[in-house]
Amino acid sequence: MSAYLFGQLSDPNIKVLHPYFDKFIDQAANIEWDITKDILYIEGEPVTDLDSIFMRSNVFEENTPKKYNNYYLMSNYIQSHKVVKYNKKYHYETVTKLHNLIIAKQLGLRIPHTEVTEKSNRTDTILKPVTGGQHTIEGNTAVYPCIIQQKITGKNKRLYVINDKHFAFEVVTDKLDYRDDPASSVIVTEIDNVTIEKVKHLMHRLNLNFGASDFMEDEEGLWYLETNTNPMFVAFDKQVEGKLSKAIRQELNNI
């Protein structure tokens, strides 16, 4: 049996994982699924040895209809077969940032003051879309309902959890959203064990066994922001000399 990697090598996150997997399926490949006979074909050849898989949709190139549909074809195939995959029981089809904030709060993680509205009476706030995909900006007024959240000034921290393993990092930047800062850098850091256990409990509640949780840290401590279910990791992996990508591959065997 074989461990498969699905994505495209123009995605640096897939490229760094490529050496650790037995076989690779390009997201733009010719993929067919004969549902009547229940046979999956890749480039005309039947797949008979698919035991586990890591999947990532390529956001570094245009998402053509073929690539879009290939991703969901494979997702549906994996879901209906005994194939090991991270977050396989995570069935939410829509973004659940707001739901996750409520669960995090229930578990004792501190969250910033948060409203979903078009205008807040609070000042010193930031705006971000409910569905994600856009960068965070300052403000308290939007033209449609957005997340309007207390602005926390401090350190950006990220905690990766892969089954029972974890890796903690800080993104060093002077920008509100580090994605707007080409000079941002990543360093290894520490997050206290109490917070780590709460995040693991949160992920268990969400049926996740792989993800990255983002925090801000100020003089009062850590503030939970969100959990990403398919995060980018290549810049972080470099700081631990490939240990993150190796863990992603190895922990597939422990699900």
Language-model features, listed with the residues they occupy:
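Conserved N-proximal alpha/beta basic substrate-recognition cap immediately N-terminal to
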Residues: 9-111
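A short linear hydrophobic-aromatic micro-motif
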Residues: 113, 146-148, 210-213
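Protein kinase-like catalytic core scaffold
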Residues: 125, 167, 211, 223-225
